[in-house]
From Swiss-Prot:
Family: Belongs to the UPF0125 (RnfH) family.
Organism: Sodalis glossinidius (strain morsitans)
Domain of life: Bacteria
InterPro entries: Mopterin_synth/thiamin_S_b (IPR016155), RnfH (IPR005346), RnfH_sf (IPR037021)
Name of the protein described by the UniProt record: Protein RnfH
Entry-linked NCBIfam families: PRK01777.1
Protein's gene: rnfH
Pfam families: Ub-RnfH (PF03658)
Gene3D superfamilies named among the record's database cross-references: RnfH-like (3.10.20.280)
Amino acid sequence: MPDIRVEVVYALPERQYLRQLVLEEGSTLEQAIHASGLLALRQDIDLSVNKVGIFSRPAKLEDTLSDGDRVEIYRPLLIDPKELRRQRADRTRK
């Protein structure tokens, strides 16, 4: 089987993690994340909680990767975006 090149990224406010990998064609998001070593490096990543995506589009751990894909591990939201907009609007009105 030919190989594919992918990137796995995880971004924090103070630091970004970027791993470039060469995997077998047919590899999944989950396999790429495990191969990146980020799970061992960052104890706060929990694949049962953190959502994942490919190029900013939501994806499933079992989705198959293509050559050149960027796998993204998302941090949990601290506050609902609608609630945040509501709070900002309230502050502006005062």
